[in-house]
Amino acid sequence: MTDEGRIYGRNPVLELLRSGGRRADEIAVLAGARGPLAEVVALARRAGVKVSFRTREQLTAIAGTDRHQGVVARVASAEYADLSGLLEIPKRRGEAPFFLALDQVQDPRNFGALLRTAEAFGAHGVIVPKHHQVGLTEAAARAAMGAVEYIAVARETNLVSALETLKKSGVWIYGSAVGEGSPAWTVDLTGPLCLVLGSEGEGLRPLVARTCDILLTIPMAGQVGSLNVGAAGAALCYEVARQRALGGKTA
């Protein structure tokens, strides 16, 4: 699921095939494949996907990078979910909504890591703005290590309007802040919620911050003043999962 219609790397391609979601048009594999690459070939053939064997140089030309790990998949262009579709996911599962919203995160590695984090800790979807925000690129898909095949991503023209729509559906909006707000583990995070993380350099934009019902902080014990957005997202998503597993017990 990338804008360019290609994904590469062993784990992303394996998860593409295991998920049974989007169909790959072709899997190009390094000739003489063994180990994980042999598993890719077996899964692709089982799914009826065309497999071709290429030299390393040919794979580099197809992927546009030499970091393909011996496999490149041609897939359909990215399809983003819509917000109403995201809201249906927790309803179908009978769970309290848990969404992650990103306010202009621009590094594809951070975006991919956050998609992986969100999926790992049980988020029902991720919401991003259309502008000044990295999309589902090859680099983001690689950083997500296959998580893009399992988690829905909605891309909205106006993030504030999207958050207001969530509020009308009974979802509380919790923003990540530095130096102000309540420590995350003192707040009950078991109800319907959306965590909002700001950009790498600026954090939450003022209007986005004002839209939040509560601002959360991650208390720091060391000398550094903050975490990057990927690390902060991991800490907060873990806290949501921890509280829900413990039935709402805060620190």
What is each PLM-predicted segment?
Residues M1-I89:
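N-terminal positively charged helical leader segments and presequences
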Residues L14, A120, R142-A147, P206-A251:
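Structured adenosyl-cofactor binding patch, chiefly the S-adenosyl-L-methionine
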Residues E15-R18, R22, E88-S182:
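RNA substrate-binding interface of SAM-dependent RNA methyltransferases
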Residues P36, Q133-A139, E202-T211:
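Short, glycine/polar-rich helix-capping loops at beta-to-alpha or helix-loop-helix junctions
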Residues T55, A76, D103, P129-K130, ...:
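Short beta->alpha connector loops at strand-helix junctions that form conserved
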Residues I62-A76, A144-A147, A152-A154, T190-G198:
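Short basic, glycine-rich beta-strand/loop surfaces that mediate nucleic-acid
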Residues Y174-N228:
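Active-site/ligand-binding-proximal alpha/beta "capping" segment
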